[in-house]
Amino acid sequence: MDGRRRNPYELTEDTPVYVISVAAQLSGLHPQTLRQYDRLGLVSPDRTAGRGRRYSARDIELLRQVQQLSQDEGINLAGIKRIIELENQVAELQARAAELAAALDGAATAMRQREAAVHASYRRDLVPYQEVQQTSALVVWRPSRRGQSSD
């Protein structure tokens, strides 16, 4: 979650709205196949208070992906389950990497701001360095005698 309140009536791709018969029709599978996939943990829809299954648009897409991997690619259901687990893990890691990159960018910006403030604070206190030319001239100082004025 991003911390913002969401409209409870807003439909997203994760909103569970489809009953099993509609989900089966949308995915092109038999309802019994959906129940089997749920038992195997391939696609786990949300449940109502009465234990009825409710599928989201994301679940429908996953059902289509499972069917494609099984029928077109010839992957068994155990292999498909592992693929789904790995894809979920990759998605979580990518999200975490994005969070860490954003935190790193924020820390780098804060560091640059603090560094600029430090540089600005000591610029007021420092006197620019100027190299003094060395000379071989000799200045003789003679204290004035009392009562005599110097020209």
From Swiss-Prot:
Source species of the chain: Streptomyces coelicolor (strain ATCC BAA-471 / A3(2) / M145)
Protein name (record): Putative heat shock protein HspR
Cross-referenced SMART domains: HTH_MERR
Domain HTH merR-type: 17-86
UniProt-listed Pfam families: MerR_1
Biological processes, Gene Ontology terms: negative regulation of DNA-templated transcription
Role description: Binds to three inverted repeats (IR1-IR3) in the promoter region of the dnaK operon.
Gene name per UniProt: hspR
Induction cue: By heat shock.
Keywords for the protein's UniProt record, in alphabetical order: DNA-binding, Stress response, Transcription, Transcription regulation
